[in-house]
Amino acid sequence: MQHLYAVETIADLRQFDPLCSEQLRTSGYLRPGDGGGGDFYWAGEDNQADDGGLVLKSEQTPKGRWRRISTGQLDIRQFGALPANGDVTQQFQKALNACRKGGSLYVPSGHYTIRQPLMVHQGTTVHGDGLLSEIHYYGPAKTGCWNAAQRTPATAMAFAGLNTFVHTQNSWAYHLTGMSFSRFDNLFVHLRCANTSAYYGPGNGESPYYNVFTNCHASGPGGEANGCIAFDWAAYDDGIQAPNANQVFGGHVNSLQVAVRCQGTGNIFHGQVLEMVDVGYEFDLPKNRYDDVSKGISNDVMGLYTEYAKIVFEQRHETCYLMAQTSMVTGHKELFRGKSKENCVLLSSHSGQLPMNRSFFEKAINFRPLEFK
């Protein structure tokens, strides 16, 4: 039987001679009590690459590795991603790479700075403490903080309880391309500058399909025409495909230009709350389909609550069909702005007149069934 030796940090572990003991405990990663410590054992024949968290190389001998005794759930602090500790992109990515074959990665409360896109692998669940788990993204323009490591075939993963801040113009929090059958739960996105998006999903043959969003929020920087979009589901990559068959339940969107920009079909938006947006739902065709033989999309909006959405529904092509029902609409200028009311249904208990829009009445857009020959 061996004694369990203890050291303060991972750096001390690397300097510890395994001949003295093959069982070792660290009190922290960079300092005692920082949450990145744990129990390790010495694998004398192991030559696996050092990943900075689960497998650690010794400075005393080239052969053998210290291996963390894992309880199943990984913690980003085990890889040196500590709150308020500067740029922790590399440490975050090492923790995500440790989930290449699936796994659960915990992001505890704190402020984390990320400066490059993070790649998430198939079967990974990333979860935190909600508003308190702050990921501040300063990555390059035209990139997203959270990305699928593999796009073809599409991958399934899950995110929950994270608060992502976007600090670079023309960038995004979640880049959904390549994600299908995935879950997004209790997420917060703060868009801190203009022309940014929260949940961004163009196609290029890898459109996001069959995903479920529950209690996912987005807030913008405010101001007129800030160019920010919460659910940005347009066909930017190739002008043909956009997200299809996704479901959004609940969530609060405020202080940005467009709450939902949708160019896909079969998406369901249920019980959302929108405040202070220029456009609530913008339905359009991908630009390369305007002259295509096959036209048309159809999406549903149910149980909508809005305050001060200038245009609640905007139909930008006459074949963008919608079925919508609102529970509360106030402070808007136009309830529906569209190219055609045919083959659409809109039920609302409120008129389209300012200032308060509280007169109750029955409202329906005419519906004519399609005729097939």
For the regions a protein language model found, what residue spans apply to each?
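Glycine-rich, low-complexity segments
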Residues: 1-10, 63-77, 346, 351-373
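N-terminal extracellular ligand-recognition/capping segment immediately after the signal peptide
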Residues: 4-11, 28-41, 101-125, 129-141, ...
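Flexible, charged surface loops at secondary-structure boundaries
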Residues: 13-21, 96-101, 120, 151-153, ...
